[in-house]
């Protein structure tokens, strides 16, 4: 099968079909959208063997990991569909007061889908953040049509997933233009899509360079559109001394497993470990060194990532004050990422912005602070993050409110005595954060609230009842939550 880049005319045709289908699909019932998402999940399950086999060949990921990721993807589709039908995200609201003098208008408001959405799949999650992943699921739940640009690192996997979506659309007797799948390894294809005047929003998971480029292209349009890009994070972990004294070995085991999970190719990998000088830190470092040496190198996703990891690691280790204190005792083979553990003083880290950047792969830094004041300086210097973690006793946390306030302003998820890897799919999850972790910190990419990225408010004033959606009509028996005069019914 050919995976050659789409031409400009092919892109035009896809976008035109998507835009035409939006006029109908945007008016579909919530039950219809739920049915579609469940149908996609069902088709993915039917094609499990083919999907996992293709992804294993294209990504070097083990089949156990891929099966677990496919389970997550199926759950996302089903849970987003169920949330869609419950309708809380519509934020239905009615304001009227017949007794008011002078007479006030009747205002009713809800959320409507924005239009065709372009989704750029990620390389490190070929199912959950790719063709049939969370961005596609949440956009379809919102009532938007979707065009997915397949990631060039796993085109066959994406093609199989796309066929599952197309089969589900046919099963539900919906328009084929609801979904389109395009190929393009060149930047040109990505630019054509994001700059097309009929595209209303963009979702992206990947590098800072890629996400920022899409954001800039969208801003250059005559009518700019939102770009929801999840780009990267170093996910700092602050280790307070009392907690470290209690469990240095356990914490080292947790963090060494976390930073090397999936060969360090998780956007939530803990890439900075910050602590104050103390004997417990020495014990922690000794244990981290021992464990890092024992972890074997493994295949990275593709040759491009291996090259970037190797060159970035060499660059970081060459910086002033950076000490390579441990690496895997096994030599890395072709295409493999070797676990690396470095240490640097807070003063050297603060002076060097390069050390603040993400290194995608099994690499982490221990930052040694002289005292609590220096630890606060490190927190102040952090850019936006997907996660920040505090390892502390409760009494330490109570006494560290300034640190906590700093971390709250710099991340989308604040973790207490845990590790950042592992992102639960649930409504309360927020997988996002301030720039440069994402381009819009108000929204997340995981959990049903991800639907909110692709909707906008619309208010109706003095509109005839029979022309309104059922859930905005005065006497509706709808189960959809709604506000009446500011009070939820």
Indicate where each model-derived feature is located.
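Short loop-to-beta-strand entry elements in the cores of soluble alpha/beta enzymes
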Residues: 36, 144-157, 178, 225-241, ...
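NAD(P)-dependent aldehyde/semialdehyde dehydrogenase
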Residues: 275-386
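C-terminal core of ALDH-fold dehydrogenases
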Residues: 334, 372-468
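Rossmann-like NAD(P) dinucleotide-binding subdomain of oxidoreductase/dehydrogenase enzymes
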Residues: 45, 89-256, 278-281
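N-terminal Rossmann-like NAD(P)+-binding subdomain of aldehyde/semialdehyde dehydrogenases
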Residues: 1-105
